[in-house]
A protein has these predicted regions:
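Glycine-rich phosphate/pyrophosphate-binding loop at beta-loop-alpha junctions
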Residues: 1-50, 100, 104-154
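Active-site-adjacent helical/loop segments in soluble small-molecule enzymes
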Residues: 40-109
């Protein structure tokens, strides 16, 4: 499960660990408006808390990177025009593959170059101005320490 770091109610609920759904306690200040709910759906919580293998929260720049990569994919992959909430899953997968601090999670999820991962993209181009701000103008850039310019799915 992937949520914005400034709206991660499911993640917060898992962290608290009492089996109950919990609201996100702050402002829902994220470009991922479609995921900025703040309160877990009780039915979804029952299913996800039992079935999801991992819960992640991501800053806005992870979703923005996902949008840019969907819009300019690797050779052979389709171009997808995605909104922020839909693109965060791709951005999160790339982050997990790229950064050493996610080695343990990568092992836990058994992610390697032979993995087949289903990404759920829950948002199309619902806000053309915002998509242009992020994709054309470079809005929400990845901070320098986290930038990677190689294919994260290639082994070195």
């Amino acid at each position: 499960m992937v949520e914005p770091d400034r709206a991660g109610c499911l993640y917060r609920s898992i962290e608290i660990g009492d089996g109950q759904p919990h609201s996100f306690p702050g402002e829902l200040d994220t470009i991922m408006a479609g995921l900025a709910c703040g309160d877990p759906n009780p039915l979804a919580w029952q299913v996800l808390s039992d079935c999801a293998d991992a819960f992640l929260v991501c800053p806005d720049y992870v979703a923005a990177k996902g949008m840019r990569v969907y819009g300019m994919p690797l050779a052979g992959d389709p171009t997808i025009i995605s909104g922020e909430s839909g693109a965060v899953t791709l951005g999160a997968l790339m982050r997990i593959q790229e950064l050493p601090e996610y080695d343990r999670l990568r092992e836990q999820l058994r992610l390697d170059r032979d993995s087949q991962v289903l990404l759920i993209n829950s948002e199309r181009n619902t806000d053309p101005d915002e998509i242009r701000r992020v994709v054309w103008e470079g809005g929400n850039p990845v901070p320098e320490p986290y930038r990677r310019y190689r294919n994260p799915f290639d082994e070195n």
